[in-house]
């Protein structure tokens, strides 16, 4: 029997594969699209039994090749570019593909865990897994939002089947180097500081001072742990926020990233005020392209996740970014 991870060469998917390996689990079929071939690097230190292109995998399950052979699908594959404007592509890639997998898993009684997104909330100031707080600002968010609505219907119709959706907030950490502009601000800050000796953040917007817009930043190691918790508990279903449960500023991320780099040089840590005074942090104009499409504040309500029994602490920005910078120093 196999465990399938889609998006396995991507950011979160490869961290899940590695977390499974650390448990001694290697009967993993990795599914992805390696058109952007550099992602293969995320799987070099992982153990899997097979790799399939995303389209080949769908064709094979529809042809019955995997009937009775899969225990669980962890569906992380998607286009996660919030700036993508091709709605037809987004809906086919994110929504329709997910629908095929969902219905196959229900038919086969296979555990189905999938990536949703905090983008489903849009500009809502309340981040609770309820329909009245949802209102995506872009087609990426809509593709995730619509699938979540179908999942709610399927859960009501199939109460004994496991379907779990994770509304990821701002995930950062190892194995995201292929993501380009969609990589985390921590990754961009690391690269900026290494190249230019300073980091850049957006000027104030939405009523927030420079760099003080706040997001729920969640370390990818915590994301992988939550996925495996639900894999261990097939009796638990639902759509769950997956963040740290706390909002922290982009300034906090910049301070942690710079100080992580300074630590590697045996230099002392600096405060935000010291970074500004020494010209190590500067602010750039808020992009026109993001106006009306930007979440200036997010903070996951973890009440439902905690009620489901997941009680491990989530890393703070200071803890997680410090670990991440150490990883980047070794691997990039």
Curated annotation (Swiss-Prot):
* Protein family per UniProt: Belongs to the NAD(P)-dependent epimerase/dehydratase family. HldD subfamily.
The cofactors required by this protein are: NADP(+)
Q: Which HAMAP family match?
A: Heptose_epimerase
Q: State the name under which the record lists this protein.
A: ADP-L-glycero-D-manno-heptose-6-epimerase
In this protein, the active site sits at 140 (proton acceptor), 179 (proton acceptor)
What InterPro entries does the record point to?
Epimerase_deHydtase, Heptose_epim, NAD(P)-bd_dom_sf
- Molecular function terms, GO-annotated: ADP-glyceromanno-heptose 6-epimerase activity; NADP binding
Please name the source species.
Dechloromonas aromatica (strain RCB)
Question: Which positions are annotated as binding substrate?
Answer: 170, 181, 188, 202-205, 215, 294
Q: How does it assemble?
A: Homopentamer.
Function in brief: Catalyzes the interconversion between ADP-D-glycero-beta-D-manno-heptose and ADP-L-glycero-beta-D-manno-heptose via an epimerization at carbon 6 of the heptose.
Q: Which UniProt keywords apply?
A: Carbohydrate metabolism, Isomerase, NADP
Q: What class of enzyme is it?
A: isomerase
Q: Which residues bind NADP(+)?
A: 11-12, 32-33, 39, 54, 76-80, 93, 144, 171, 179
NADP among keywords = yes
Read off the domain note. Contains a large N-terminal NADP-binding domain, and a smaller C-terminal substrate-binding domain.
Q: Name its pathway.
A: Nucleotide-sugar biosynthesis; ADP-L-glycero-beta-D-manno-heptose biosynthesis; ADP-L-glycero-beta-D-manno-heptose from D-glycero-beta-D-manno-heptose 7-phosphate: step 4/4
| Cofactor-binding details, from the entry | Binds 1 NADP(+) per subunit.
Q: EC number(s) on record? A: 5.1.3.20
In terms of superkingdom, the source organism counts as Bacteria
Query: Per the record, what are the reactions this protein catalyses?
Result: ADP-D-glycero-beta-D-manno-heptose = ADP-L-glycero-beta-D-manno-heptose
């Amino acid at each position: 029997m196999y465990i399938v991870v889609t998006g396995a060469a991507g950011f979160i998917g490869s961290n899940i594969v590695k977390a499974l390996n650390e448990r001694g689990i290697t009967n993993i079929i990795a599914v992805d699209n390696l058109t952007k071939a550099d992602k293969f690097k995320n799987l070099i230190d992982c153990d899997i039994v097979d790799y399939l292109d995303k389209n080949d995998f769908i064709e094979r399950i529809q042809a019955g090749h995997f009937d009775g052979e899969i225990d669980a699908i962890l569906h992380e594959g998607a286009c996660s570019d919030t700036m993508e404007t091709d709605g037809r592509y987004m809906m086919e890639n994110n929504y329709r593909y997910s629908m095929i997998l969902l219905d196959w898993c229900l038919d086969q009684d296979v555990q189905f865990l999938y990536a949703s997104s905090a983008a489903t909330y849009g500009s809502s100031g309340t981040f609770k897994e309820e329909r009245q707080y949802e209102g995506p600002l872009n087609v990426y968010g809509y593709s995730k939002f619509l699938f979540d609505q179908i999942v709610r219907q399927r859960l009501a119709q199939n109460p004994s089947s496991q379907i779990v959706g994770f509304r990821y907030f701002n995930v950062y950490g190892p194995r995201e180097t292929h993501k380009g502009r969609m990589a985390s601000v921590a990754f961009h800050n690391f690269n900026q500081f290494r190249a230019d000796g300073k980091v850049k953040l957006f000027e104030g917007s939405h009523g927030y001072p420079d760099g003080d817009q706040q997001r729920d930043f969640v370390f990818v190691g915590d994301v992988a742990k939550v996925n495996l918790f639900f894999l261990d508990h097939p009796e638990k279903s639902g759509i769950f926020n997956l963040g740290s449960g706390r909002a922290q500023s982009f300034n906090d991320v910049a301070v942690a990233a710079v100080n992580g780099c300074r630590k590697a040089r045996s230099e002392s840590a600096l405060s935000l005020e010291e970074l500004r005074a020494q010209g190590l942090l500067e602010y750039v104009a808020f992009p026109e392209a993001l106006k009306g499409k930007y979440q200036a504040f997010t903070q996951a309500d973890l009440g439902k996740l905690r009620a489901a029994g997941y009680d491990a602490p989530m890393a703070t920005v200071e803890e997680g970014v410090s670990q991440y910078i150490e990883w980047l120093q070794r691997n990039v």
